[in-house]
Amino acid sequence: MADSKEIKRVLLGPLFDNNPIALQVLGVCSALAVTTKLETAVVMTIAVTLVTAFSSFFISLIRHHIPNSVRIIVQMAIIASLVIVVDQLLRAYAFEISKQLSVFVGLIITNCIVMGRAEAYAMKSPPIESFMDGIGNGLGYGVILVLVGFLRELFGSGKLFGIPVLETVQNGGWYQPNGLFLLAPSAFFIIGLLIWALRSLKPAQIEKE
């Protein structure tokens, strides 16, 4: 029987209290690479959430049958299989987005969040709790990704999901797009500001010197 309190903790905790990017500083590379557009940020969020949830679920199911000496290999094999499925689905049904995400879908295999939850939680917890933990951490990762993608696309090109929101000077409007937001360093600054804002609201997350 699944523990409802534990499910609530693992599902909601990673959103703000224990965010994978803002607190644990994991998965930052893909956060820089796929957030120039809100659309790619949302798709990457869905992909990572599904892979993290299902890999944790399957690893938890067989955790008592995995020899300790090969557990990392087994975890990576399960994660890689799920990533291949996600990649093929994107190629089949969202080819343009698949091209934009490029190698970063494949690199979900080595994403610290996915591997970390498999090793730290799924290997020690029941399947349902592990699945919900995967959902929670995927969404926690996605909250930061979507916020960064929102700001970068809006201020970098005046669009959201490719639809003009701020009328640009080139089209007779008032907004001059800020090209800096389309460069990778801007994502560093935005993530840094989000971490600062979150830790200002939750002082307990500030590291002790």
UniProtKB/Swiss-Prot annotation:
Gene Ontology terms describing biological process: sodium ion transport
Keywords in alphabetical order: Cell inner membrane, Cell membrane, Ion transport, Membrane, NAD, Sodium, Sodium transport, Translocase, Transmembrane, Transmembrane helix, Transport, Ubiquinone
Topology class, membrane: Multi-pass membrane protein
One Pfam assignment: Rnf-Nqr
Catalysed reaction equations from the record: a ubiquinone + n Na(+)(in) + NADH + H(+) = a ubiquinol + n Na(+)(out) + NAD(+)
Annotated TM spans: 42-62, 66-86, 95-115, 131-151, 178-198
InterPro entries linked to this entry: NqrD, NqrDE/RnfAE
EC number: 7.2.1.1
GO cellular component term, pick one: plasma membrane
Single annotated GO MF: oxidoreductase activity, acting on NAD(P)H, quinone or similar compound as acceptor
UniProt keyword Translocase present: yes
Region forming the signal peptide: none
Functional summary from the UniProt entry: NQR complex catalyzes the reduction of ubiquinone-1 to ubiquinol by two successive reactions, coupled with the transport of Na(+) ions from the cytoplasm to the periplasm. NqrA to NqrE are probably involved in the second step, the conversion of ubisemiquinone to ubiquinol.
UniProt record similarity statement: Belongs to the NqrDE/RnfAE family.
Assembly and oligomerization: Composed of six subunits; NqrA, NqrB, NqrC, NqrD, NqrE and NqrF.
Protein name: Na(+)-translocating NADH-quinone reductase subunit D
Lineage of origin: Bacteria, Pseudomonadati, Pseudomonadota, Gammaproteobacteria, Enterobacterales
Gene: nqrD
